[in-house]
Amino acid sequence: MAALVSRHTEHFATAPQIGPHDLVEIAAMGFKTVVNNRPDGEGGAEQPPNAEIEAAAKAAGLNYAYLPVISGQITEQQARDFAHLLATAPGPLLAFCRSGARSQNLYQLAGMVASSAPASRQ
């Protein structure tokens, strides 16, 4: 599993599809939050259901979020939701999808929407 993780920053990494059996190792690698960006059923019978991955993540002491996105169809709201997760979820954070590329694209879009957000009024 460690060889498949791509670290983008000290606080963020991506990975291809993980399974429930990977969560203990992910926790041992120091991650605090796991985000599933892959819609349930997208990969057919070989893809573990979100509920199984979430249960294994929680059993391993990890925070978990499900933010499914469709490749090539990421919305601005999904990018904003991901930016919120990045800002509020305990890190480091590991996001995954089928190959890791969709999670990386979502991360880049989240950075764009976060940097374009108007400053809060005081």
Describe the residue ranges of each PLM region:
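Short cysteine clusters
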Residues: C97
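Cys-dependent protein tyrosine phosphatase-like superfamily
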Residues: M1-L94, N105-Q122
